[in-house]
Amino acid sequence: MLYSPLYQSIRLILFGALGLSSLTVSAAINQTDSMMPEPLVTDSSNQYADDVATDAGFNNEINNQDISYQSDSQQSAAYKKASLSSDATLSNDAAVNNNNITAINDRTKTSQDSRVAPVNTSNAAKAGNRRIDTNDESIQESLKRLAEFYELTPDTNVATSNNTGTSVNDEQNNIQNSLTPVTTNIPTVGSNLRLLPHTVDSAARCEGQWVYPKKNPNYQRAVNEASASSGQPAPNLNGLPNNQAPLFAESDYGYYDNVDYAELSGNVIIDQGTQHIEAEKIVLDLSNGVAAAQGKVMFTDQATGNVSVNGAQDRTQQNGKTSLTDKATQGGLIGVADNLNYNTETGQSTATNVAFASVELQAHGYAKRLNRPNESQYELDEVMYSTCPPTNRKWQFDAKSIDLDTETGRGEAYNTTFRIADVPVFYLPYFNFPIDSRRGSGFLLPNASISSENGLEIDVPYYFNLAPNYDATLSTHIYTTRNPMLSGEFRYLTENYGEGIFNGSYLPNDKEYDGEDRRSLFYDHYWSSTSIPRLSGEAKYSYVSDADYLNDFDTLGLSDNTLNLPRRAQLNYYNDYVDGELKVETFQTLDALNNNGQMLQDKDKPYSRLPQLKLDYRLPWAKHFDITGVSDSAYFKKSIDDGSENEKSGTRFYNKLSASYPMENSWGYIKPKLSLQHLFTTYDEDSLVDNSLDKDDGSQSVFVPQASIDAGLHFYQAGSPFGAFDDTLGGYRLLSPRLKYTYSPYRDQNDIPNFNTRIASINYEQLFSDSWFLGHDRLQDLHAFTPGINYRYIDATGVTRFDGSIGEQFYLDDGRVTLDNTKPVFTSSSSGLVWDTSTQPYNNVWVDVSGALTNSYDLNYITTELRYQPSDRSLFNVGFIKRQRDENTNQLPLSALTASAVFPINNNWRVLAQGQYDYNRNQMLDSLIGIDYEDCCFGFAVYGRRYYNDLNIAEKPTQAIMAEVRLSGLGSGSSRLTRLLADKVLGFEPVQNAWKD
């Protein structure tokens, strides 16, 4: 560019405007959303990576390239002589640092003595809580100018759009499908139903959306002309970083005195890459050290000319994966101001009447005055922020003043008020908050809930930023029916020793629990070796003061009501040949009822492992043989203090060595295998005394060989079943019959204690296992053959439309090995018929059915699950389970129905429900129902749950009523309700993501 001072003026104004606005949005976002603990880091030198407030001296080098065809001297004369109409200037200089700008009101060059700099108000008084009057004429004018970039959404009829009307994208897809010879899918079932809206338009929740200003159409033309004059190819501006893009300026008038004063005025438009600024006048006065943009200033860092078919710019959906602070620093800002001023000597900047909007966040705000007294400090006066539409601001944050410091990464807000429908909800005279990724101590957002057990509960957490690699949170829980409870969390992260978290709580003299003290302590630690690959470890500790603790202080039952709370330390290692685990584990067993409705005794508690070593290994040197081994050694301890039985603690060693010779081909396989198992157990001293045994009688050793042959065939055929879907789905079918023979002889094991072994539940895959015992305290005598068959249909798109298996295990000899000196396992002629099927007849319908019959072909159990998803945002599940008592597997009887539904009523409202009903007991075991509201401004949900404690089904049910309010654009988007439904409702997470999008 010919005139470097003028070029510097443009650069300073352009980047200064964007820098000031970016800090304003970051301040507003962080003030409301940063009240959540950030992830811990081990690097203590965290810095603010997106510091837009850097000041530097501007480049004084002259770039002589412009779009004019005149000589340099001719251009100089032209600029000094007169004003130029439609003046356009272009530069490829991208070496100038971004600097914040201030604006002056001088329209002519002033003397050095009359220099006027912005006033530093960093020490000004912050008193007073006068609210920001958005009806003020100057504020209304700024917001009105900003609202030019809020594009209203045309009214749409959802039902009509479902029946008729084809979008451009649909037409393009139809054309593509007609040109591509691919099979078509079966249409989704229920597409013609109109009971509920088939399509929910998230965009229709808003009156409109913020859109980017359009790029100057002369920009690319100027770039092309400049490149042509220099004999170089024109750069492609799409995707080119802004600091590498040419700079283009256009105005009605341009002036330069060839010394220290330059000016553009009259419809000034400046572009560099996607950055765009407009003003009535831009001035650079080197003698006074000021640069200025004056009169109806507008700026953005994402100017675009690309418009989607519906007239609005496309927005990338983040699905909650990016933090709000990160989104704010990604750009997408639009701002308007009366003027911008920048002092080139001190770096001080000011702007007045600044209204800003973030397209990425769909948020907007206002600041009466922005001042940057130095490179690291910012001052904002009379600030407003909201994610609501400018036409209907349902809530907003107001602050009398905000001070930001990029060196410390902290901000201070004075006289902050949160308003809903112009009604103040809460007020903070002073609030300290972070403005970057560095964490800081302070209060987090409080929570409130109502339940039948605790009444009204209010939680007030306080966050302690102790160090970059550890922090803590202390919470006070206030109940209307109990005494206050104090809980805390401590997190740490080390460079070489892993990471962990402590959680604890204490409630003295609980009025709802006979005045007893209630306590809990949980600890988790995870570690991966930095010096030994694939070596890791973990530690876990759990403690509660009573069996009712988890139920009483987890209102919606989000914590697992585990009967046995684990306490363990564990090391893990694996490579290509070895997978090992060494652990020490004990349990806290809570008071509960057993299957017979009696209180648990010591004999019902699990064994501690002190310690246990497990190894799975494979020998590498056998070329055609597959030689594998299993080793499981442990010392099991269970003290019997209530006399419920004699103590049986001791050491167990189990080893199994197997050799197989697999013969595999595309059409089938045969896998013969030989195994040798060894089991050795010995009682400890306490158990020998309790059982009146000597050392020899207290030790047992058993060897059991095993032989098996597993064979299968694969039959492939193109086309659909019976040719029914050849013209639609296409695809192919696979038929895989399988037969396995297993033999292992009987060995007496009645004197061997059972430490942790149980009988597996019956299912199709279990039919082909080597043993029905899960655990290594019993070596089964099994002489059986198992036929089975699997049939699959896969369509042309790769979707498995049907997957079904059926099989049965037939016994050639009766089983004689018992688990606990009771009835032997499987003394009948067969296991009974077992099946497992999964079907997807339509793209939005799934049906799963599995079950088993007894050897006399009576029902053993059956489970069914039907899932119907009429749209991306709706879901219906219905399930049924019926189980008979099975003496072989200790299966308890159950007859239950399960159902869940998530469906929208319209674009804003939806219903959520889930339930489980035991019709044998005529009892609703678990039920939840709620309504959820969502628009572009805020959301809320009201829901209730009634459920039984899993530890004691005979107790009265727990009832809870909860309400939550969400402010769009603030918070993580996750809640207690969504976390609960994600655990209870199959397929909920994708439906939830679609609803939020």
Swiss-Prot record:
One BP annotation, GO: lipopolysaccharide transport
Gene Ontology cellular component annotations, sorted alphabetically: cell outer membrane; transporter complex
Stored Pfam families: LptD
The UniProt record lists the keyword Hydrolase: no
Gene3D superfamilies the record matches: Lipopolysaccharide (LPS) transport protein A like domain
Keyword field: Cell outer membrane, Membrane, Signal
Signal peptide: 1-27
Coiled coil: none
Domain of life: Bacteria
Subcellular location: Cell outer membrane
Keyword Signal belongs to the record: yes
InterPro entries the record matches: LipoPS_assembly_LptD (IPR020889), LptD (IPR050218), LptD_C (IPR007543)
Primary localisation category: membrane
Family: Belongs to the LptD family.
Cross-referenced PANTHER family: LPS-ASSEMBLY PROTEIN, LPS-ASSEMBLY PROTEIN LPTD
Quaternary context: Component of the lipopolysaccharide transport and assembly complex. Interacts with LptE and LptA.
Protein purpose: Together with LptE, is involved in the assembly of lipopolysaccharide (LPS) at the surface of the outer membrane.
Annotated protein name in UniProt: LPS-assembly protein LptD
Gene this protein is translated from: lptD
